[in-house]
Amino acid sequence: DVYKRQDETLKGQYRGIRQGTCFAHSHYSGLSKLFVKQSTDAPLMTASEVWFLRAEAALRGWTDEDEETCYQNGVTTSFHQWGIYGVEDYLQSERKASDFIDTYDEENNIEARCKVSPKWNPLDDKETKLEKIITQKWIAMFPEGCEAWAEQRRTGYPLSLIHISEPTR
């Protein structure tokens, strides 16, 4: 079982499975009661999602709002929703996604596709700005997996790792 494997070299590190790798669903998944009852405590739409929708609308010229302000409000609202501190530093960060390194099989290593940082740059082209907005929206949508998936299918963002089993996706 991949999750119960003990390896002292990985102690204290995040262990995850890259999208597209092949594992039987019985190794990692079960149907949650959350998905089979009539009501839910899960958010259907959050204030941060609304801010990101407004940022996208402004970027596309559908409103007179300032896309940078809406973008920053979206990130800030998401941080506040989840009780996370440091939003000011995050919004100034120029850090980008790291490459994926598989410590067990280097054939799975892959360069990060997402090349945008959280910091807004008014000189970026429209597509880069859209990538920033949607990438942050996707992060803020936790735990709305289905909505985040639909957003990624709609826009192509965030640029995630290529699925090993579906290289043409």
What are these regions (language model features)?
Residues I139-R154:
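Bilobed periplasmic-binding protein-like "clamshell/Venus-flytrap" ligand-binding domains
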